[in-house]
Amino acid sequence: LTRIGESVRVESRLYMSELINQKTTIFDEQVSRKPNKYPWTEKFIEAMHNGFWTDKEFSFKSDYHEFKTQLTDQEREIIIRTLSAIGQIEVAVKSFWAKVGENLPHPSIADLGYVMANVEVIHNNAYERLLSVLDMEDVFEENLKLEWIQGRVKYLKKYTHRFYKDSRKQYLYALILFTLFVENVSLFSQFYIINWFARNKNVLKDTDQQVCYTRNEENLHALAGCQIINTIREELPELFDDELEDKILKEAGEAFLAESKIIDWMANGINEKGLSALILKEFVKNRINESLAMIGFKNVCEVDEEILEETMWFEEELIGNNMTDFFKARPTEYAKKSQHYDEDDLF
């Protein structure tokens, strides 16, 4: 009996040692808040807290006047379609981040998800109010019925479709689709258009600043999503097989086709320096390729670098670290809402 008891104790110690040393992943629940296995989440949370804003900061009064008096009929239609397309995504698609902690049950990951979800609520409210102030609500509702708008919603909601029995791989698939195409691609042609009008026509300054805030935060969300994806790759490389990459690359091609239809509609025939349907399509192709590269996948789009060169001003603004005071149009040294955070800032 003594030998048996000793044997049981030895086996128990070995079993407990195995449990302690057993590799855990981001999919395994962590009940206690400490230690924080993913301290990089704190940098993203801090960046979003430092950039807090609300739509109440803007009156849009001058924008309304400029919209009615300083734009041509063609330009007004472009703005209407562009803001409708932004509002469609912000209002109809964004609910993903609030549930990230249910699938990746770590306190720090859940916190990050809640903070990003709160930012999406701010975006939702901001664009609802902007559409109201500019008296576009009826047009917005009508535009949502258009075939190419519905097609975009359909492809952007593919992340909700189940393709894998393995719950971890299914969530990874959904996370990749949402991060790459909802956060890092779908809204950026619209951001580009609004920023272009403010830059080249000197109009819609409040709208432009709201778009800058949104643009920088969507970029930050994409960086956070890619960090989560790359963490999964480090911990569970077997999930990243050829079949998954092929599926994502196919979805990327479909994303470009859907976005191209939206671009043709939004651009409304405009052909000016730095702004045309052709330029916007090359811009979106490049964002798709960059998104894929951020998670270690190969490119899927052939990009005309000469045309893309005309969009470099947007990229320079996006990666700039200083806030631009849009009343004085000069760099300022304090950190606030429109400050961009890139990988070097965060890690």
Predicted segments with their positions:
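Acidic, Ala/Val/Gly-enriched low-complexity intrinsically disordered segments
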Residues: 6-11
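Non-heme di-metal
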Residues: 15-347
